[in-house]
Amino acid sequence: MDWEGVTFGAFLGVAGTFGMLALAFYPVMRRTFLLWNAVRTFAFCLMGLALFPVELPAFFPTGEARIDIGEIALSIAVGCTGPFLAAYIEERAPYARIRFWLRTMLPIGVLGGVATALAPWWPRLDWLHDLIILAMILGLLVALIVA
């Protein structure tokens, strides 16, 4: 056992616990941010499994496919952050535009995942994925500052 393994296990444990708690509380609270939180944490866990250099079962892809799975999961996780935060923002008129833009981040994140999946055939799409991630992070930052 080394510190990398301990840190990775702690990350998966904390992220998995948050995701499972969000799903457990959803039937009681009926708030959509709980579902978005569960999807986000699942995507972050998948990203961690795919990108961390740990031995995985034989059915899990290896090599470039494993890296692509991690990058697709990252795109989905960052894309789910927009609707997750939009569920928190009040539905008053001044914040309607911010909520709209936060909700559009999921399709943009899916587009980044598709760009990653197609990158083996069109290598320039890797750059598109990186630019999409950067744009989503900047959009989240601006939305948080304005809200």
For the regions a protein language model found, what residue spans apply to each?
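Individual alpha-helical transmembrane segments in multi-pass integral membrane proteins
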Residues: 1-113, 123-134
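Hydrophobic core of alpha-helical transmembrane segments in multi-pass integral membrane proteins
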Residues: 107-118, 137-144
